[in-house]
Amino acid sequence: GRELAGDVAVVDIGLDVSSATQHLVEAADVSAWWPNRSADAHKWNGAVRVIAGSAGMLGAGRLCAEAAARSGASLVALSSPGIDPQARSEIIQRRIPAVEFECDVFGDLDRFRALVVGPGLGRVDGTISSARAVIGEATLPVVIDGDGIFAAAWSADGAGPLLRQRGRPTVITPHDGEFALLAGHAPGIDRVADARALAAELQVVVLLKGPTTV
């Protein structure tokens, strides 16, 4: 297996790959996708709202906000329910209630271009309920990770009804355990096929985390 493969080099051997349906994402691909900032851009053109972190798991929110800033977000606002978030001074830090925080989030959410919900959020019932409300009612692209995935699936009907009705770009980032929570089974040998099947079922983009992320 992979542990015995040593160094692996990917080289062009002249095959026609024009009809390929699976691609390896490389640094050049990411660079090509990066949008150019317009000459009159300002901080609200690419602002990201992050709802993440909780007591004992503040690092998750901090890492998420830092990643958004490093990836080019023009402004990042971080909130951790019920506790003061921790991040470097360039990150806007807003405290929101531990439960029933959706009204606080929606207060100015229309100014942001993307929303992240879930890393280290915790699983208190009131927090999960508010996270579901935010995910379901947000009218901008949403990335759902960690406890946000748990919140989405926190229903007798699973995550499908909540995610399918959104009608906006949605990305979920499950590891194998969270994938099983959503799909009812762990990913098998063909992780690409399993990720595609879940994406089609939930009408979202699936980033399946692991040693080889799909």
Regions found by a protein language model. Give the residues of each.
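Small-residue (G/A/S/T)-rich helix-start motifs and N-terminal tracts that mark the onset
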Residues: 2-146, 150-171, 176-214
